[in-house]
Amino acid sequence: MEVIILPDPGRIGSLAADAITALITRKPDAVLGLATGSSPLAVYDELVSRYEAGQISFRQARGFTLDEYVGLPADHPERYRNVIDTAFAARVDFAPGAVQGPDGLADDIPAACAAYEAAIRDAGGVDLQILGIGTDGHIAFNEPGSSLASRTRIKTLTRQTRVDNARFFGGDLDQVPTHCLTQGLGTIMEARHLILIAMGRSKAEAVHHLVEGAVSAMWPATVLQMHPHVTVLLDDAAAQRLQLVDYYRETYRAKPAWQGI
């Protein structure tokens, strides 16, 4: 696990975009894992800028979202498939149908989850997955207590997650769905490169457990310690609980430019 601490969202977004640009350059048909939430927005904005400047194209690439609310109408602005379109996918040149998400309106939820797993597998797996982290350590919608080997499935959201997400629903907790479909921790761990982004003081406790804590289902993100290629991008506020913060800064300053992330 590589921990990189940067001073602002722009720098974080640029570094993550560098990794995606390098991937697309060497593998134009790469499969990207796309996260929603506020953490990846700087990455998406930077990628859009590079696309508009003719520096990158997603014509051959594919994308898979991490999760989806159950029961939100297809045209609801907070349906995650629509959120990804607004934030990124519709702003660049993905081919029609190249970006997929779990079907939160399916009549047969278990079958929809199995089909999503099959779609990722048939695409060759995810090359690079963008992740955020919740204040309670969840990634995607794998809430505390989730199996570290879990696959795509339906989950009940914790009250804390619903409170955190109420800001996207006008602050009305009653409008936040209680259930979701989410890639499992086992599914996420099969991506070849994971880039997790965390910013702000509210994420500091979760980041502390993610990087320096024991692997535990109570802090689901800690499973990433077992992955061979994880990059954690933090701002100063999110890094403030880390015991080895000076070491992480030193190792990044000394890193050869050719190594990338």
From Swiss-Prot:
Pathway(s): Amino-sugar metabolism; N-acetylneuraminate degradation; D-fructose 6-phosphate from N-acetylneuraminate: step 5/5
Family annotation (Pfam families): Glucosamine_iso
Any single GO BP term: N-acetylneuraminate catabolic process
Active site (UniProt): 67 (proton acceptor), 136 (for ring-opening step), 138 (proton acceptor), 143 (for ring-opening step)
GO cellular component annotations of the record: cytoplasm
EC class (word): hydrolase
Domain of life, source organism: Bacteria
Signal peptide residues on this chain, from the entry's feature table: none
UniProt KW keywords: Carbohydrate metabolism, Hydrolase
Cited CDD domains: GlcN6P_deaminase
Swiss-Prot/TrEMBL catalytic activity: alpha-D-glucosamine 6-phosphate + H2O = beta-D-fructose 6-phosphate + NH4(+)
InterPro entries reported for this sequence: Glc/Gal-6P_isomerase (IPR006148), Glucosamine6P_isomerase (IPR004547), Glucosamine6P_isomerase_CS (IPR018321), NagB/RpiA_transferase-like (IPR037171)
A GO term for molecular function: identical protein binding
PROSITE patterns: GLC_GALNAC_ISOMERASE
EC number: 3.5.99.6
Record's keyword annotation contains Mitochondrion: no
Functional description taken from the UniProt entry: Catalyzes the reversible isomerization-deamination of glucosamine 6-phosphate (GlcN6P) to form fructose 6-phosphate (Fru6P) and ammonium ion.
Protein family (similarity comment): Belongs to the glucosamine/galactosamine-6-phosphate isomerase family. NagB subfamily.
Protein name: Glucosamine-6-phosphate deaminase
Annotated source species: Mycolicibacterium smegmatis (strain ATCC 700084 / mc(2)155)
Gene this protein is translated from: nagB
